[in-house]
């Protein structure tokens, strides 16, 4: 009987039902801790990572949605329709470890004399929601990419202007133009608003050389993972000395490249790195092999990072190579191989010559 109770406790469907009924952020935290158990036991059982991503993403979304609902219960019903979008890793459904919360809030356009009151309400809502999320364990984003930041809580028209200026004059706005704003998933609200944002992005992306130049250079800016002699390039100093930065040197280049190509091929509705590469293999069959290798490499690398993060209760960004056996080191090295070809493909497709 005991095993059954434990497996019920860690059943994703049951967990989501409980989240929907929860009355406080403190209780949500207990349910978030169970998600970590689910992730750990799934990895232990060797369940495919892509499947684990989907389960975790559903549970994370339910937690975020409930955090916003609890804030609404406190504040009273919203004066206008809105959408709460997760951006970054949760927007890509790639959040397994507790990382920062990244979000934006988009509310529908209202008549000018109502604007201030409406915006006031949504700023309050965003503050409450993010503080609920903080209680659950999602730390506030260090870059301030949060709906509760005045910059990231605005009307649909203001967001439209924001994306227009980011995408049409990327150089001018490079300080706050973060590519994570192109990875989004709605946690709460009006799907029409999310569609409107998506349409703005894809309209601006059409044959926008300047924008792809910017994103392309951005994707190529990360440091190589292996030296010329195929040795891992490790941290030379600081608290992570001698460790391998799997996030910056391996995962980010794949995440950035998948986004870059997906936007340039107009692939809509797919914000996940693995799925983006699979879709690209269909959109650009001539280079299908490269994309499929990258999709698989992404999962392999992500699994290394997740295991490291669960072991150390951190973000898993730095891999201690001395703790890997020979076989794992080989697997890690092989997963870095497709990046070379991908880099050539980017330079070729976007004719990148100058590196900003």
Which residue stretches match the model-derived regions?
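Generic beta-strand/beta-sheet core signal
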Residues: 85-87, 104-108, 141-143
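Short beta->alpha transition motifs characteristic of CBS
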Residues: 1-10
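Long, non-coiled-coil amphipathic alpha-helical linker/lever segments
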Residues: 15-49, 325-344
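Catalytic metal-binding acidic patch
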Residues: 92-120
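Conserved nucleotidyltransferase catalytic core and NTase-mimicking acidic/glycine-rich helix/loop elements
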Residues: 80-82, 192-193, 198-356
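Conserved catalytic core of two-metal-ion nucleotidyltransferases
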Residues: 31-43, 53-66, 74-81, 115-181, ...
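… and, occasionally, acidic/histidine-rich disordered N-termini of signaling adaptors
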Residues: 76-90, 98
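Glycine- and acidic
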Residues: 42-53, 106-116, 237-243, 285-286, ...
